[in-house]
């Protein structure tokens, strides 16, 4: 018997099979890999599954409420980062900035490898990036504003450059001291709370 469908909304599309991957663990702040330039990702290497790597990076970014994370921030020697928000992340394999604006902006940044540290970093306002997607296909995208900044910070990270290296020693020292002070105050307040509860 033949069934006539008058409305395509009546058709139930097959459920998408989305592989579930565990997030990575973040590399310690003093990990050697954070200061290393990561070599080109080889799509032909049999044990490197781009989908798994990209998916795990996305899960890690989501877990830490981050707009972007590079693989070496998770202790992995893959030249890839992901950037995005909610369900809209892009994996950038072997990324390279091919064009940047002369106009710059100076705004606060932080990153998962230096949690709590907030620094005003000067960067180009827009960039054009060439990279390979999950299938190894070459792509070129242009970014402005916050997304351009996230992309630049992640590419820096893959080149062994932390955002703290983009400011003067004086600025970094002041910010580090301010953070240390906040941490000590937080610990003191939490110690007091624990003591009172006993």
Regions found by a protein language model. Name each.
Residues 1-198:
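Positively charged
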